């Protein structure tokens, strides 16, 4: 067994609340890492002050949301990754989360797949030089993201094989993949070398991990058994106004 670590997505768990409150609550719950979506729409000075006051690390943040499936957006995507690498260095994180864009209805799917692979190959040298891993994110289209291109994990893992870079992997969102395909444990076990980060939320509803059909303590035990040592980002919207109790309980699931 190896150390699997929790991280709290402050954009969802503490939506509309201050960085200071979010970071203090995370630390008091016994968790030592946070993550968030966009770095470009935040007061990074205030965020880092709250993070450092509470002795937290930043496990991940996002790249700019620019399509990879449209070659016309390639230059903007590369520029966005370059800017996100600079932000990641400032924030001390080595994981960047990338969405891939929506389906182009007028273009064959194979061409969109190829564009995605080509774009990732172009940014791979930037990531390698910076020692930062970019993780592409499959999302469910049935409930939360209608029209999104990358839905199934098998295509995501195929893309990683085709790109063939140690610095480009998949973020496996357990909530999204439960909706899209199920078979969570086998898909994780068989592809753990291609996974760089996890996300988790209860299903249905995308609320606390304690609520729903996914047996998270068991899932986390199975991830530990693969010797994965990265983070599981807790990315959910709480049903309860006070986040502390649920976070503290989940933190206990990571104690070995």
Please provide the spans of the model-predicted regions.
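Conserved beta-strand positions in the central sheet of alpha/beta enzyme cores
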Residues: 35, 60-62, 97, 135, ...
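Short acidic, glycine/proline-enriched helix-loop-strand junctions
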Residues: 43-61, 132
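Active-site acidic/histidine proton-transfer and metal-coordination neighborhood
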Residues: 40, 53, 70-169, 179
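N-terminal substrate-binding region of glycoside hydrolase catalytic domains
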Residues: 23-38, 50, 62-66
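Histidine-acidic metal/acid-base catalytic patches
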Residues: 1-30, 92-94, 150-172, 176-256
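Metal-dependent catalytic neighborhoods of phosphoester/phosphodiester hydrolases
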Residues: 44-48, 73-74, 108-111, 242-246
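Active-site-proximal loop/turn and secondary-structure-junction residues that shape catalytic pockets
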Residues: 12-14, 38-40, 64-67, 101-104, ...
């Amino acid at each position: 067994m190896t150390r699997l670590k929790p991280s709290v997505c402050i954009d969802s768990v503490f939506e509309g609340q201050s960085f200071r409150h979010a970071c203090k609550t995370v630390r008091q719950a016994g968790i030592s890492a946070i993550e968030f979506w966009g770095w470009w729409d935040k007061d990074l000075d205030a965020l880092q002050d709250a993070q450092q006051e509470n002795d937290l690390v930043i496990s991940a943040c996002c790249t700019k949301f620019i399509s990879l499936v449209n070659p016309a957006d390639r230059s903007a995507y590369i520029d966005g990754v370059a800017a996100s690498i600079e932000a990641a260095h400032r924030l001390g994180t080595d994981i960047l989360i990338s969405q891939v864009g929506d389906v182009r209805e007028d273009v064959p799917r194979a061409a969109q797949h190829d564009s995605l692979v080509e774009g990732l190959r172009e940014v791979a040298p930037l990531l390698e030089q910076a020692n930062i891993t970019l993780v592409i994110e499959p999302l469910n289209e049935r409930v939360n993201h209608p029209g999104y291109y990358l839905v199934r994990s098998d295509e995501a893992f195929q893309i990683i094989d085709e790109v063939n870079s140690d610095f480009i992997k998949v973020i496996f969102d357990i909530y999204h993949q439960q909706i899209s395909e199920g078979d969570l444990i086998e898909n994780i076990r068989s592809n753990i070398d291609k996974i760089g980060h996890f996300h988790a939320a209860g299903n249905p509803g995308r609320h606390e991990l304690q609520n729903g059909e996914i047996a998270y303590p068991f899932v986390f035990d199975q991830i530990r058994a693969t010797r994965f040592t990265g983070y599981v980002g807790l990315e959910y919207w709480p049903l309860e106004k006070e986040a502390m109790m649920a976070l503290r309980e989940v933190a206990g699931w990571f104690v070995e």
